[in-house]
């Protein structure tokens, strides 16, 4: 299976870069998945969790909002704010707390925020 290149960038710098099997993005019209060979598109992202599947694990990045450019072989994400939640990390609890704060500050839509927060807590 061909791998997709992905980069997640915020104004302060790069949050994540790598080659992945798939990525699920929180689009403003709903979540959508991207695999290698996807049609080209540019879309707006809402507050949510980017789900990244690598060859041997799943990784998650919480964002408050941003843009994604998708091409056949790569996904470039420019977010206003992002927190990389590493599954096997000593600062995981701190990352989850920062992600919750980022999302709570991102939207006044309490229902949408609580849904994303529940997703983060289940990671």
Curated annotation (Swiss-Prot):
Protein keywords: ATP synthesis, Cell inner membrane, Cell membrane, CF(1), Hydrogen ion transport, Ion transport, Membrane, Transport
The protein's role, per its UniProt record: Produces ATP from ADP in the presence of a proton gradient across the membrane.
Primary residence: membrane
Topological type in the membrane: Peripheral membrane protein
Recorded family membership: Belongs to the ATPase epsilon chain family.
Assembly and oligomerization: F-type ATPases have 2 components, CF(1) - the catalytic core - and CF(0) - the membrane proton channel. CF(1) has five subunits: alpha(3), beta(3), gamma(1), delta(1), epsilon(1). CF(0) has three main subunits: a, b and c.
GO molecular function, a single term: proton-transporting ATP synthase activity, rotational mechanism
Lineage: superkingdom: Bacteria
PANTHER family linked to this entry: ATP SYNTHASE DELTA/EPSILON CHAIN (PTHR13822), ATP SYNTHASE EPSILON CHAIN, CHLOROPLASTIC (PTHR13822:SF10)
Protein name in the entry: ATP synthase epsilon chain
HAMAP family in the record: ATP_synth_epsil_bac
GO cellular component, one term: plasma membrane
